[in-house]
From Swiss-Prot:
This is Large ribosomal subunit protein uL15. InterPro entries: Ribosomal_uL15, Ribosomal_uL15/eL18, Ribosomal_uL15/eL18_sf, Ribosomal_uL15_bac-type. The keyword Membrane does not apply. NCBIfam families: rplO_bact. Belongs to the universal ribosomal protein uL15 family. GO terms for molecular function: rRNA binding; structural constituent of ribosome. One of its GO terms (cellular component) is cytosolic large ribosomal subunit. Residues 1-59 are annotated as: Disordered. The gene is rplO. Residues 21-35 have a biased composition (Gly residues). Binds to the 23S rRNA. It comes from Alteromonas mediterranea (strain DSM 17117 / CIP 110805 / LMG 28347 / Deep ecotype). Pfam families: Ribosomal_L27A.
Amino acid sequence: MRLNTISPAEGSKPTGKRSGRGIGSGLGKTGGVGHKGQKSRSGGRVKPGFEGGQMPIQRRLPKFGFTSRKSFVTDQVTLAEIAKVDGDTASLETLKAAGLVKKEIQFVKVVKSGEVSRAVTVSGLKVTKGAKEAIEAAGGKVEE
């Protein structure tokens, strides 16, 4: 067997239908497009969102809000994820090393979801009130 002799199994790749090749093909004459009208012409398609001349919905509805650029570099981490960090200190660098946040993240907030069973020192991260209580109850501490 050689690379130039390999071919797909018989019948696994049916040949595509060729339109406009006679009435016996099933796609002759109009080629599956029908008679006249905009959609039978060359280049005859309407753009996405076109509503027949009626004002389209994306223009009828107002613009609103904006996306804060800080949201692209901010993430949140749960207590259950903090427990996965090696060592007893959780900081931005250790979270990145553990693969819990992406490398472009600059700000992290610890939220109370799940439980932390061992003493962990959280440094340089924002912490919610409930998460702070849970960390301190487990014997850990929070350093701003």
